[in-house]
Amino acid sequence: MANYSHAADNILQNLSPLTAFLKLTSLGFIIGVSVVGNLLISILLAKDKTLHRAPYYFLLDLCCSDILRSAICFPFVFNSVKNGSTWTYGTLTCKVIAFLGVLSCFHTAFMLFCISVTRYLAIAHHRFYTKRLTFWTCLAVICMVWTLSVAMAFPPVLDVGTYSFIREEDQCTFQHRSFRANDSLGFMLLLALILLATQLVYLKLIFFVHDRRKMKPVQFVAAVSQNWTFHGPGASGQAAANWLAGFGRGSTPPTLLGIRQNANTTGRRRLLVLDEFKMEKRISRMFYIMTFLFLTLWGPYLVACYWRVFARGPVVPGGFLTAAVWMSFAQAGINPFVCIFSNRELRRCFSTTLLYCRKSRLPREPYCVI
């Protein structure tokens, strides 16, 4: 442990002004993009009534979590880098900032897992999804996620998995020690388990969609009919379906007596269901991109944490650790870009709202009432 601290001090002493400038510039850019981007998406989701439904409630919650982390936690990291990787705000402030950072991380992980489950329900069990996933259900899920996140982030405040200022990371977070005297390993294992479970749910969803798209050979069975209705044993039911859709002529088939013929609405309902299915797939693709980017940007930092817990010999290289920490910071500002570039509906609503705000109002003509 002493060797680790001594090596870290040597790395910090060799920190060049150029490195500090790059850190401050990149972190300032991340703060601005994250706060502005997530705030714009939040305003759009709250203002447009067509987006007041299940998947976008969760997206609004994710945006609020990223705004919380970017607006409160990142400025303290900025000041830490500016002051030469030192903390000048006291132990209690360090614990509060670390609590908020870990809270946001676990909240995003839990919420992405819940979103993956709802995405599977939206495609595999669409009728159940549309009936049960109401506003109050989404609110209950959001409250549950925040409760679980607080339960995960609060114990270190009471020195169970101690929060402290890590100079190599320029932030207050978990103090990762060797696994023999470590009490933060359980938190990291749970986070990795949540990310793995989220990927498995999306993998199951991909298999479900692939199985439904797989074309199977048609097995023709001979059907017998005297009046071209083709009902009874051996019939595929297509003639009856055509008659119900309004394309049948002649008398009613015997098996369809008492059923009213519908000429127009059946085709419309089928097209509406197909459009909804495609829309749900696009939304699922957007949330999977968010999940994949979360895993990609947080992955190197998790590797560095496990390295410090289990490795006995060499410490984590300073360049790798800095890049991993800043990649985890960048995750807070990546979701607005994913929303705009991968969701056609959000892009259309955003352009409509922007054009409406920029539209100049014509002056009123003077008139008189006769």
UniProtKB/Swiss-Prot annotation:
It is found in: Cell membrane; Endoplasmic reticulum. CDD domains: 7tmA_SREB2_GPR85. GO terms for cellular component: endoplasmic reticulum; plasma membrane. Residues 1-25, 79-96, 159-188, 308-313 are extracellular. It is a multi-pass membrane protein. Keywords: Cell membrane, Disulfide bond, Endoplasmic reticulum, G-protein coupled receptor, Glycoprotein, Membrane, Receptor, Transducer, Transmembrane, Transmembrane helix. It holds the Pfam family 7tm_1. Disulfide bonds join 94-172. InterPro entries: GPCR_Orphan/Phoenixin (IPR051509), GPCR_Rhodpsn (IPR000276), GPCR_Rhodpsn_7TM (IPR017452). This is Probable G-protein coupled receptor 85. It comes from Pongo abelii. The gene is GPR85.
